[in-house]
Each structure stands twice: as structure tokens, then as C-alpha cells.
């Protein structure tokens, strides 16, 4: 099991994997938690759905480790598809593949991980050694620190690299990647909505990245052209004032599926806790579907419980997680 993902506490009702130790012989139970004390887990149906099977009780002395899982079974190809669509939405100023075709290296503003990291998108990336010499040379040329984007499972080789040199890396918080299909959507509501091909100064003035204003160059990269469609959405007060914003992208995954991704969600101070985040999300989902998107994804820091609840209300479920690892300066 991964050492860098899913260390959060589990709760009743959640889907988990529990490893049992029978005198050195290990066995995993995957299912839904019925009780924590005693630990009772009902094995899952195919696909990760709840079942009616008999529950399994795991005594404390047998429990080796327990980890929370995403609500449904996820294939590695599902994870890769979303990360490919995301990479197309955040290409950076320059991007190129390593010579083995397994890692996409991106350099941009030096601020956001999505545009300034190397990510394992090739089908064999999880099984081959990380091509660190190429990655280090790429970021040295751009005068940026080495940063690896590590999606769980398909980033297994990067996890091994970090485990071998834990003191050489700084790990950022876990990020949830949440998804939903666009077949049936919530009603957008009657708040005035507008979407533009490019943001104006009012949109840019409202946007912050993790609570901080972005430098001018980073804002320029945010609106740079991508291999897909981009839209800058906003909600308007009756006076015409911009009161909430978001950036939407339509990009393809490797299998040709069109994905709506939306990010840069911000609600103006004084307008928060009025349901505008939900209304903005509903409008963006409707816009994405009208533009031909079949599914939607977004990313939220795992510790942002309010954000996670908001997106669950919009029909999103956690699919997988990823983290960024930054190489620390080497001491001579």
C-alpha cells in the first residue's frame, strides 16, 4: 500500500481496504465500514458498490493497516485519462516529454504545481525508473525547482524514489481529484451568469491562488491558449458587479473523451455563504455539456472539507488523489 496517500481517518459508511496479519500471512478486505469498535467491514460488490454480504470482524491484533478508498473501483487507465485532460488544460509556458515518452515536463509561472511539474502520463511510467537526469536538466534550464506530480498508483515509481531519499523531498498536501458525468445536471438557478473567452481586469482582480494574489506573469499564463476550449465564467450581482468567478476548460483524454475541468473558483467577500459556489458550479456544468463535454473533473485540497462538501452537492465523487513533491536544495 502507498505510504504517501490516504492517511486520513476512516468513518462508518466509507469504502476501505483493511490488511489483516495472520502470523505473517497478509490478507486484504475491501468493503464498507459498518462499525469501528469492533471493526466490522462488509465486503463490496463488483465496482465498489455496497453489498449484502456477511460482515467481517477484524480484531485489533490482526489489523495491520486500514486506508480509506475512493467510493468506486478505479482503473489505472481512468486515473491516467483525467491527468492527461488536466495536463492539456495546464500546459505551462513550455512542455516536452522525456526521451522514454513516459513523463511530461512542464514549466510556467513557477507558482502552480499543475503548470510547473513533471507528471507520469505514459502507460509504463509506473514501472520504469524516474528519468531524473532529464527532469533535473529541464527545470535547471528554466531556473525552477524540480517538482514531481505524483498521481496515486500510476506514480508508483516516483513513490519509490521518494522512499529512497525522503530527506531530499518536500511533499505538498494530498489533492482529491473528483469526477462526475454530465448526463443529468442540477438546475443552474436564476443568478445571472456570463462566460467569456478571456478574463477582464475585474475577473483577474478577484482571483487568488490558495488565498494569495498571483503575480502578473502567472495571470498571463492562466489565460494562455490551450489545446482545447477555455472559458472564464462569472456570476453577476443585480448591479452588474462580478461576485464569483471560475475558469473552465474543455480538453480530451487519451481515449477521446471530452472533459470539462473547472478551477480558480472564487466568491467575492461579502457574497460568501449564499450558495453562489453551488450556483456557479451548476452553470459551469451546463456550459460544459452544451460545449460537448461528456464528463467533468475538478481538484480540491483534501483538508478543504467545505470545498469537498460543496462539490459532493454538485454530484462529484472522489476518483483518485495526487500530490506534488518538490526537490529540496542540495547541501554541498
Language model regions located:
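Conserved RNA-binding domains used in RNP assembly and mRNA/RNA metabolism
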Residues: 1-100, 104-111
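Short amphipathic alpha-helix that is part of the acyltransferase structural core
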Residues: 1-8, 12, 62-83, 119, ...
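Acyl-donor-binding surface of acyltransferase catalytic domains
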Residues: 83-92, 128-215, 325-326
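Conserved acetyl-CoA-binding loop-helix of GNAT-fold acetyltransferases
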Residues: 128-137, 263-267, 273-290, 295, ...
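Conserved GNAT acetyl-CoA-binding A-motif
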Residues: 142-151, 288-299
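Conserved beta-strand-loop-alpha-helix junction that forms the acyl-donor binding cleft
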Residues: 149-156, 298-308, 324-331
Amino acid at each position: 500500500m502507498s505510504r504517501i496517500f490516504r492517511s486520513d481517518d476512516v468513518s462508518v459508511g466509507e469504502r476501505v481496504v483493511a490488511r489483516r496479519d495472520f502470523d505473517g500471512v497478509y490478507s486484504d478486505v475491501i468493503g464498507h465500514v459498518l462499525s469501528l469498535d469492533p471493526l466490522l467491514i462488509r465486503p463490496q460488490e463488483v465496482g465498489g458498490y455496497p453489498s449484502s454480504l456477511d460482515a467481517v470482524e477484524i480484531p485489533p491484533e490482526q489489523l495491520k493497516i486500514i486506508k480509506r478508498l475512493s467510493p468506486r473501483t478505479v482503473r489505472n487507465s481512468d486515473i491516467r485519462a483525467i491527468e492527461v485532460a488536466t495536463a492539456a488544460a495546464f500546459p505551462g509556458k513550455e512542455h516536452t516529454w522525456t526521451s522514454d515518452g513516459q513523463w511530461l515536463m512542464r514549466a510556467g509561472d513557477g507558482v502552480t504545481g499543475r503548470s510547473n511539474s513533471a507528471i507520469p502520463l505514459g502507460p509504463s511510467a509506473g514501472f520504469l525508473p524516474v528519468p531524473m537526469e532529464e527532469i533535473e536538466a529541464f527545470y535547471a534550464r528554466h531556473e525552477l525547482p524540480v517538482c514531481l506530480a505524483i498521481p496515486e498508483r500510476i506514480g508508483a515509481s516516483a513513490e519509490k524514489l521518494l522512499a529512497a531519499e525522503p530527506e531530499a523531498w518536500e511533499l505538498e498536501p494530498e489533492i482529491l481529484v473528483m469526477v462526475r458525468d454530465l448526463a443529468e445536471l442540477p438546475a443552474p438557478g436564476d443568478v445571472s451568469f456570463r462566460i467569456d473567452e478571456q478574463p477582464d481586469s475585474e475577473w483577474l482582480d478577484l482571483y487568488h491562488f490558495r488565498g494569495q494574489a498571483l503575480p502578473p506573469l502567472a495571470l498571463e499564463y492562466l489565460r494562455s491558449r490551450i489545446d482545447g476550449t477555455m472559458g472564464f465564467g462569472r456570476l453577476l450581482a443585480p448591479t452588474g458587479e462580478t461576485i464569483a468567478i471560475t475558469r473552465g476548460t474543455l480538453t480530451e483524454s487519451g481515449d477521446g473523451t471530452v472533459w470539462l475541468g473547472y478551477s480558480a473558483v472564487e466568491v467575492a467577500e461579502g457574497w460568501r455563504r449564499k450558495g453562489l459556489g453551488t450556483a456557479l458550479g451548476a452553470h459551469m456544468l451546463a456550459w460544459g455539456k452544451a460545449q460537448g463535454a461528456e464528463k467533468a473533473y475538478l481538484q480540491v485540497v483534501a483538508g478543504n472539507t467545505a470545498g469537498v462538501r460543496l462539490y459532493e452537492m454538485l454530484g462529484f465523487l472522489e476518483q483518485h488523489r495526487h500530490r506534488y513533491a518538490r526537490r529540496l536544495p542540495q547541501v554541498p
